[in-house]
Amino acid sequence: NIYLEFEAGEDVTEHMNKAERRQLRQSFEAGVEVVLEPTKEQIVEWYGLLKRLYRRIHRPLPSVDVFLKLNELNIGRVFVVVYNDRVVSGSAILCKLGNSQLFYDWYRASVEDVIDGVYPSVVSTWQAMQLVSDMGGGIFDFMGAGLRNKEYGVRKFKLTFGGELTSEYRYRKYLIV
């Protein structure tokens, strides 16, 4: 896992590397918007991105109903990133469960096509981190970082936002014959 700690009201861009800060600025200049309270239709559209991703990587995915309820149950946040009236990214964050100061970067998906000057994954990652700061600070857990000795693009991307690799684990499937 990769942890990054934020104070309340902190500018989280200070933790990001120069390239990601530039991509964030370019995305907003191009007209990207973050919708912190998305409509049901926007969440369903984002879920379509998630579903395609999880089908491709062969991982289980909860029902869309889980994400539709997340904001109203007050245990997490779902937000989307919109560009030209199209949902291009989004995230589901679990917030301070129990007495914990941890925020979990639970699910994220972005469009796979390239849009000139727009970096949906950078925007949704930044917004997830900003929510931690806006909600009083705490520790942002990027979650999965793969195995250290194996090349893993997702880990490389997450580390550009700062943070510290704290642990590694990987589930393994064993067949019992």
Named regions from a protein language model:
Residues 1-11, 135-177:
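Active-site/acyl-donor-binding loops of N-acyltransferases
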Residues 1-117, 147:
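A conserved beta-strand-loop-helix scaffold within acyl/acetyltransferase catalytic domains
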Residues 91, 105, 125-128, 158:
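Polar/charged side chains located within well-ordered beta-strands of beta-rich proteins
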Residues 115-130:
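Conserved acetyl-CoA-binding loop-helix of GNAT-fold acetyltransferases
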